[in-house]
Amino acid sequence: MIFDVNGEYARALTPLANGNGIGVSHVVLDGTAAEGRFRLPHWFLEQSEWELLLQASERTQVPILRMALGLSTLFSGGNAQELNGIKNHILATCLSQILRDDSGSPSKHDRMVGLLQRFNTQQINNPTIAQFIRINFGQMANPQGLTNYLLGGAQGGGFIIDGLKMPTYKSLPFEFSALGEALDLAILYEEAHGNRQIRDYCSQMITRFKSLEERAEYAFLRHDLQGGGHDPSMGTFLSQLLGLVQNDANWVKRNQLIIIDMNSVEDEVVELVASVLARMSFRLLRQADPRNRFPVHLLLEEAHRYVASTPSRYAIDASRVFERIAKEGRKYGLFLLVASQRPSELSKTVLSQCSNFVIHRIQNPDDLSHIRQMTPFISDAVLKRLPSLPKQHALVFGTSVNLPTTFKVRDADPLPASDDARIRDLWFHEQGRAAQVLIGVAPIQQAGAGDVFD
């Protein structure tokens, strides 16, 4: 599986599918939800990935987010009765808390009306409680009647659920917008227990969620189930991801190479997609029986952009999952091939687990020093040659090579889309000469599409 962040590999590798018995799948991620593009259903994200994506703080925001994700499971699962019961429980708890407040009746009335304008159910809404909370001469008409209606009396009834346990997140399909409603319910439930400041504490997380809901580059993550959006199962998605098709009771390999073209998206999207796909692949191979019988290689192009030694400034820190794969992946048949121009910026944990190295020309002193620390058995004479290595030449060393060796890489045919600009030929353009370049063409008009996980 190739994480192609520069859109280079399809031109070179797609022809391998022509009569060679090597299936090649080329999928394009451009951030849109257009037909034929890569899609990643948002419910495939784990709870910890949601926490990172929304940058939820551990002490206040994470508990609210976990409760909201659990509620989102009810939004999706068709269990309308259970969801309505929890909503009634939360509203009844909130209204009861307001009744016990020391403020005056007019203030309590206004707070209840405002609350039920935002959140209400068929059983608890402004019309159903109006008879209890109307103000007569500065006093609420029938507060005890409202208490009996909400909490029940000697004859039973009421909406409070004793010993209620909030549902846990189960990665079931749900509308992306439903998480926003679930966050509001979770905050409301916390407010009902006296935490008046929780909404302010969670305001940044809510803002980040609304940003994800609106940003065009995250359209690939948002699935519209009500609008007829395709609802892939995780098994179907993973089988396509690993190039498998089912033939009766057996899995058959269809594609040997899966190229995920991420040239059209920014680093934060690359980091999110790479992290989630790597984690899903790792989990699948850990659960495979027998283990270690289906090796998978992840080729991480420009790895310093999302497997960095320092925490990411974006939401998802992909280094975590790749560090675990680097340490444990060999037990399950998952391996990393890390390609980077800046080895000094890569995760030290990932680099420490690499057993073979192919090093092209490197001139940066920090990178040279880093290589020296990684490979103490290489002589200074060999390292001094690295800044002056010709194009297509590299130094190879590691467990697969008896002695560090410099070699020339054979010409690729066909070449990847990574040619250097011919500055000498293209710098000067006579007036009126055609530029021979298309400007402003959207990625969806340029790229081809192969199998798509949508």
PLM segments and residue spans:
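Glycine-rich phosphate-binding loop of nucleotide-binding enzymes
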Residues: 1-31, 40, 396, 428-429, ...
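P-loop NTPase motor domains
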Residues: 2, 7-17, 39-324
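Conserved P-loop NTPase motor module
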Residues: 121-124, 139, 143, 152, ...
